């Protein structure tokens, strides 16, 4: 299982990559492994305003459907349209296949996210339980 050191994470297994006031958001390797084969991703619309903690995407796999929750508040400025035709990209490259990009409303919310070294321990514990 892979955890990248240049990202921040949530307890719901989303990752955040910050570029100035823009944040790219996707699901972690840990999440895609739990979901298994991803077959569909329901994406939001560009210009949607989504508050921290609200659902921004639904990911369906052969095992289950899972909501993804916005780690920081903001406005959707980009969606990864590749996922409409190739949702399995989230399995193949979870850190290269972001879901949305947002213009953050409050960068201070980033302080509440999980650092990579802590998230790695969380995933290791989940692996032991599996």
Curated annotation (Swiss-Prot):
Cofactor binding note from Swiss-Prot or TrEMBL: Binds 1 lipoyl cofactor covalently.
Any one GO CC term of the record: cytoplasm
CDD domains, per the entry: GCS_H
Chain ranges of the Lipoyl-binding domain: 22-103
GO biological process, one term: glycine decarboxylation via glycine cleavage system
Superkingdom per UniProt: Bacteria
Keywords: Lipoyl
SUPFAM superfamilies from the UniProt entry: Single hybrid motif
Classification via InterPro entries: 2-oxoA_DH_lipoyl-BS, Biotin_lipoyl, GCV_H, GCV_H/Fam206, GCV_H_sub, Single_hybrid_motif
Cofactor(s) this protein requires: (R)-lipoate
Modified residues (N6-lipoyllysine): 63
Family annotation (PANTHER family): GLYCINE CLEAVAGE SYSTEM H PROTEIN, GLYCINE CLEAVAGE SYSTEM H PROTEIN-RELATED
Assembly and oligomerization: The glycine cleavage system is composed of four proteins: P, T, L and H.
Function field: The glycine cleavage system catalyzes the degradation of glycine. The H protein shuttles the methylamine group of glycine from the P protein to the T protein.
Family: Belongs to the GcvH family.
Protein name: Glycine cleavage system H protein
